[in-house]
Amino acid sequence: FKFDAGIEPKNSVQLIEKTDRELVKEMITLDKFIDVLIPRGGKGLKKFIIENATIPVIETGAGVCHIFVDESADIEMALPIIENAKTQRPSTCNSIETVLVHRKIAEKILPELTEMLLKDKVELRYSEEAFGIVKNTDFTHKENLKLATEEDFGAEYLDMIMSLKLVDNVEEAIEYINEHGTHHSDSIITQNIDNAEKFLNEVDSAAVYLNASTRFSDGGEFG
């Protein structure tokens, strides 16, 4: 049978295997054949399509996601959550780009966190204060430990790159995320229920998590 639109079910989903930019440029001008585009990919691809398409475009947002490690965080819990959120599939928009660490536990967590992520071959870009805590430690792949610039905070890397900075409290973390994030997915690692509730209520993101990875923001997990 056929639907009213005359489309056979077996042909309702089709795959274009070529991915070169010239083909994309041609396709996004076929307004006689394509009704709407929903681009998925990196910032460069989305910008290219928005600037060149003659077809209506539904723009999808970037994913600058954060994890805040609070003063009361269980460090043994925090480490694998951060590792999962950054390294499992870094090219996705629900992977984290920045970790915020409460200043009072920085000296306790940073050496172990840094060693873990450097072993995973993540390039780390630390704020000056955070960098100062670990700069004299002999890490594996220490060449990937670098000082961050202002451009790193708010950047969507979609790669094995992560920035990190220290904050004084949950209020500062919330303010930073709301200013530098893209309102996608953000998480707090804490044992303090008041700080957890404040973070979950005041971070203006589509998904906020307590003691969990931002990688849960996906169709399969949401059913």
Positions of PLM-derived features:
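Conserved acidic residues
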Residues: 35, 97, 206
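Short, well-ordered beta-strand elements within core beta-sheets of diverse protein domains
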Residues: 99-101, 159-168, 183-188
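Catalytic core of tubulin tyrosine ligase-like
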Residues: 169-170, 193
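Short acidic-hydrophobic, aromatic-tinged amphipathic segments that line or gate anion-handling sites
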Residues: 15-18, 145-148, 164-168
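C-terminal core of ALDH-fold dehydrogenases
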Residues: 112, 175-223
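Rossmann-like NAD(P) dinucleotide-binding subdomain of oxidoreductase/dehydrogenase enzymes
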Residues: 1-72
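ALDH superfamily catalytic-core signature
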Residues: 3, 45-159
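Residue-level signal for inorganic ion chemistry
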Residues: 37, 102, 173
